[in-house]
């Protein structure tokens, strides 16, 4: 009988190669790895160069997410610059039209990105020309930006150049909407509160102080009378069910005064006086 072949395949024996051949292989592998890493570095630098061409003067940042209403973007000069070519073009346009119109120009700017607030806007748009007044619309309760603002320039020509240059300009992931407002549409209260730091109204503090304010005797009597009337109706209903309830509401005892700091008292008085 013939012997059955074992199911286990025999592994190929490794051929012993001379040391010189192994050294050459190692050198070739190292050169190949170095070439791949250099190629990847060149590709990355090309992508960065393209980004700079399309978006001059802006850097990419991962900190542009909305986290808190008071978060600010990087306002360094490198990020806020328009770029040499754009700045030359703008100055040329302004110099061509500077003798035409001397009246002021008002610009509407919409779709403002998160973190691009009054300080950043003044820094940015001052590159075009002197900014006289600037007001960004904010929520009265929270103080959050409504993402649009009004800017008054010294010259109407500058405002026209800004509207032409910056309309649909990509800024921190948002396309700016710029439009010159005609003089007859500029409202007298459009710049009310401009260049004044926004102060959030402390609604919680005001409500707490109003709640903790001691009641007058007349108001306390009124509250007790109303509560006793409701309690009387409840007693009648419980009596029909066979339950007797003996209780009444009277004037509470005067609470002992709690010692508080003078500074907090003064602060609370100022808060109440400012928002009456």
Curated annotation (Swiss-Prot):
Residues 21-35 have a biased composition (Basic and acidic residues). Keywords: Nucleus, RNA-binding. InterPro entries: Nucleotide-bd_a/b_plait_sf, RBD_domain_sf, RRM_dom. It comes from the Eukaryota. Residues 252-261 have a biased composition (Low complexity). GO terms for biological process: assembly of large subunit precursor of preribosome. Its main location: nucleus. Residues 105-183 form the RRM domain. The keyword Transmembrane does not apply. This is Uncharacterized RNA-binding protein C1827.05c. It comes from Schizosaccharomyces pombe (strain 972 / ATCC 24843) (Fission yeast).
């Amino acid at each position: 009988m013939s012997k059955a072949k074992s199911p286990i395949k025999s592994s190929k024996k490794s051929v012993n190669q001379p040391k010189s051949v192994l050294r050459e292989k190692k050198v070739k592998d190292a050169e190949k790895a170095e070439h791949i890493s250099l190629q990847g570095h060149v590709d990355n630098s090309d992508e960065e160069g393209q980004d700079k061409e399309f978006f001059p003067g802006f850097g990419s940042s991962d900190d542009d997410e909305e986290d808190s209403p008071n978060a600010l973007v990087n306002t360094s000069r490198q990020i806020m610059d328009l770029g040499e070519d754009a700045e030359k073009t703008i100055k040329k346009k302004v110099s061509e039209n500077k003798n035409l119109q001397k009246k002021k120009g008002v610009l509407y700017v919409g779709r403002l990105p998160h973190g691009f607030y009054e300080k950043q806007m003044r820094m940015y748009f001052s590159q075009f020309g002197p900014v006289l007044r600037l007001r960004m619309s904010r929520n009265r309760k929270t103080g959050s930006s409504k993402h649009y603002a009004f800017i008054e320039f010294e010259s109407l020509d500058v405002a026209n150049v800004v509207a032409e240059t910056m309309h649909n300009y990509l800024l921190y992931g948002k396309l700016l909407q710029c439009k010159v407002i005609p003089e007859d549409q500029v409202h007298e209260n459009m710049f009310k509160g401009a260049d004044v730091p926004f102060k959030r109204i402390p609604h919680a503090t005001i409500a707490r102080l109003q709640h903790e304010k001691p009641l007058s005797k007349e108001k306390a009597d009124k509250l007790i009378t109303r509560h006793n009337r409701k309690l009387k109706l409840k007693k009648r209903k419980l009596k029909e069910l066979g339950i007797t309830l003996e209780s009444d509401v009277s004037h509470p005892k005067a609470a002992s005064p709690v010692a508080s700091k003078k500074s907090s008292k003064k602060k609370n008085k100022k808060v109440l006086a400012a928002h009456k």
